[in-house]
């Protein structure tokens, strides 16, 4: 939601400007228009004077100043560049030109112009922000030391804190300035932004309301309110908040329109992502991340990886997303390297002082231990925020696996059955773990029914192997024999015959012990006859002899 760019934005048409209504025949003074922040009127007056030959010395500088404050940075750039070419160029123009380059995302040019300007508070603030953009910590600290305890410098510092995810530090500065300057209403929006980033959406709404009472049509404030509604309620509630902004098609704030289009994609669950997000990837920082999330939801892991592989993460969200993408790619490719990278990213976020007590931080630690297969530790973290995700299918999917992996198959089965997503319920990991839970919980018939519902595939073959072996270990020989029988038909591997033979003998022993109905013997004989092994006749002869002696129909 920050108004910053990551690529140059020159070229194209200037934003449309509204015509001013005439209030009389008296020509207003430039000073009056500037004091009223009527920058459109000021430009009109300056252009008129230029046209009739009444141009003053700094006309182009004032036009550049007004265009800059209207957000028309391309026009400001044109005026300032022309001013630098004049013979008696005012040296102050260089810092104004540098600021314009900065807002157009032309950071190298901004730095070059900034160093040509005479030393000033504004120049130091500009170079401070450029050092942050270039990730130059040494320069950042040098310019930081030059900041003074004046409002402009402190606001600049708060902005850097925000961009470095130091939200509480930014809040402290804004609140301190607000104590003595209640008229600085916009600071409430900045405070609300910080609370939003800290996941305090209700607090963000309360602070934002102070500003919206005075400025009810603020684009940025209404957009933030919509984002809070999205987090607190749902996408429809958020979209309703944006309706007034969408209806206001005449708004000259083009970047806000890009922001709204971006957020609508998020509010609508990714609808229109491929049409809206790609052009915004280097304009709105979150656009790249949301496009990566879209690709992940479409199971296009490779495309997600291509989009994020060169991103140097600087925020917890970026580290987390890189971790998720590497984990998904590692599972898809069977790559230990990608899994290791994912585990390190998760550990970095979850172990950080700023994130260790947040839900995302604990999710990261759970993910880290999950990849390390340390499921007791996984459960420690998952249990700490379980109450927030009772109906969340993804959470339940991971929680059930961890429960089952630690031997608590009873609760694992219960949680698996809470999952509603058909996509997850058809996933082999879900089917195999649920089958294992059924078997361990002495419900082998339900595990067998899971197999019967599957189409013939490599996954169904793997599930058969699981049922055959796990049922055998648990002494559930009937379903073990059935599974080994199908495996033997599909693949004449001697091991499958040995498994079936052992399971059939196991059933016979259970019949002898009175723990299995005698009628089951008929099906056991049928399973044995389907095998061409020489040992079959000897086993069948013994079983038939017993059946005859005990008058069991076969």
Swiss-Prot record:
GO terms for molecular function: intraciliary transport particle B binding. Its main location: other. PROSITE patterns: TPR_REGION (PS50293). Keywords: Cell projection, Cilium, Protein transport, Repeat, TPR repeat, Transport. Gene3D superfamilies: Tetratricopeptide repeat domain. One of its GO terms (cellular component) is cilium. The gene is Ift56. Component of the intraflagellar transport (IFT) complex B required for transport of proteins in the motile cilium. Required for transport of specific ciliary cargo proteins related to motility, while it is neither required for IFT complex B assembly or motion nor for cilium assembly. Required for efficient coupling between the accumulation of GLI2 and GLI3 at the ciliary tips and their dissociation from the negative regulator SUFU. Plays a key role in maintaining the integrity of the IFT complex B and the proper ciliary localization of the IFT complex B components. It is found in: Cell projection, Cilium. Residues 1-27 are annotated as: Disordered. Signal peptide: none annotated. Residues 18-27 have a biased composition (Basic residues). Belongs to the IFT56 family. This is Intraflagellar transport protein 56. Disruption phenotype: Partial embryonic lethality and patterning defects. Surviving mice show hopping gait, polydactyly, hydrocephalus, and male sterility. Impaired hedgehog signaling. Primary cilia are not reduced in number and their length is normal. Mice exhibit defective cilia structure, including abnormal positioning and number of ciliary microtubule doublets, abnormal localization of IFT complex B components and significantly reduced ciliary tip accumulation of proteins GLI2 and GLI3. The keyword Protein transport applies. Component of the IFT complex B. Interacts with IFT46; the interaction is direct. TPR repeats lie at residues 57-90, 92-125, 151-184, 468-501. One of its GO terms (biological process) is photoreceptor cell morphogenesis.
